[in-house]
From Swiss-Prot:
The keyword Cytoplasm does not apply. Belongs to the LCE family. This is Late cornified envelope protein 7A. Keywords: Keratinization. It comes from the Eukaryota. One of its GO terms (biological process) is keratinization. InterPro entries: LCE. Precursors of the cornified envelope of the stratum corneum.
Length: 95
């Protein structure tokens, strides 16, 4: 028996095969959130979190550290705001 005849003998009828929608693909569903952006440098994160001014990262936090350290630090806000920091300075400030 040749290979082709053997293959045809064991093929299942089309009605036995599972029916998937034509658009079905093994990719992740569209409801998945977009991947997170890369984290900003730590100097920006700490400065933004302490100052509370987001991307502006005021030097006020360096001049009055006790006042700003008492403020609640929200990690979700820090992650969102620190993404605006493009340049970090040795003082911990960013712009």
């Amino acid at each position: 028996m040749s290979y082709q005849k053997h293959q045809q003998k064991w093929q299942l009828p089309a009605k036995c095969l599972p029916k998937y929608p034509s658009k079905w693909t093994p990719q992740a569903p569209a409801s998945c959130p977009a991947p997170c952006p890369p984290p900003a440098p730590s100097c920006c994160v700490s400065s933004c979190c302490i100052s509370g001014f987001g991307g502006h990262c005021s030097l006020v936090s360096l001049r009055f550290p006790r006042f700003y350290l008492r403020q609640p630090q929200h990690s979700d806000c820090c992650e969102h705001e620190s993404s605006r920091c493009s340049t970090c300075y040795s003082s911990g400030d960013c712009s």
